[in-house]
């Protein structure tokens, strides 16, 4: 018989650095999930990834206090900042430019994020990534 799902929890955790301190510990603890078990499993799963990369994770927890988790790709903003080599986006996106990014870089990001985006094809995914870039104050070139 299948386990009965008690709920789902969405978190964004840095790769390889899940620990029981806030915000992870309290979020899992109040739902009765074994915090250390999650931290060990998550850190093992993200061992090969770039340390500190923000990873969205969806945790499904069951009534018997067990859990499973699904990791997604890092946010588009993380990829954009990394490709444009900037620390943060523009505080006034319409007026001040934070940097620039090429269409080829946008295509690379769209291909990496394709399975997480709600897009039918690569052009749709590129349009979404391009919109995110503009809202961060990045100039799209080429």
UniProtKB/Swiss-Prot annotation:
The gene is rplK. SUPFAM superfamilies: Ribosomal L11/L12e N-terminal domain, Ribosomal protein L11, C-terminal domain. Disulfide bonds: none annotated. It holds the Pfam family Ribosomal_L11_N. Forms part of the ribosomal stalk which helps the ribosome interact with GTP-bound translation factors. InterPro entries: Ribosomal_uL11, Ribosomal_uL11_bac-typ, Ribosomal_uL11_C, Ribosomal_uL11_C_sf, Ribosomal_uL11_N, Ribosomal_uL11_N_sf. The lineage of its organism: Bacteria, Pseudomonadati, Pseudomonadota, Alphaproteobacteria, Hyphomicrobiales. One or more lysine residues are methylated. One of its GO terms (biological process) is translation. Keywords: Methylation, Ribonucleoprotein, Ribosomal protein, RNA-binding, rRNA-binding. Belongs to the universal ribosomal protein uL11 family. GO terms for molecular function: large ribosomal subunit rRNA binding; structural constituent of ribosome. PANTHER family: 60S RIBOSOMAL PROTEIN L12, LARGE RIBOSOMAL SUBUNIT PROTEIN UL11M. GO terms for cellular component: cytosolic large ribosomal subunit. Part of the ribosomal stalk of the 50S ribosomal subunit. Interacts with L10 and the large rRNA to form the base of the stalk. L10 forms an elongated spine to which L12 dimers bind in a sequential fashion forming a multimeric L10(L12)X complex. This is Large ribosomal subunit protein uL11.
């Amino acid at each position: 018989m299948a386990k009965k799902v008690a709920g789902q929890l969405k978190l964004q955790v840095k790769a390889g650095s899940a620990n029981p301190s806030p915000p992870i510990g309290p979020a899992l603890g109040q739902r009765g999930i074994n915090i250390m078990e999650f931290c060990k499993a998550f850190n093992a799963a993200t061992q090969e990834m770039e340390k500190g990369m923000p990873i969205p994770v969806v945790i499904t927890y069951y009534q018997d206090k067990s859990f499973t988790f699904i990791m997604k790709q890092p946010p588009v903003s993380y990829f954009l900042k990394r490709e444009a080599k900037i620390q943060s986006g523009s505080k006034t996106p319409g007026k001040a430019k934070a940097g620039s990014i090429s269409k080829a870089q946008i295509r690379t990001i769209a291909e990496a994020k394709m399975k997480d985006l709600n897009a039918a094809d690569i052009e749709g995914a590129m349009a979404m990534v391009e919109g995110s870039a503009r809202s961060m104050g990045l100039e799209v070139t080429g």
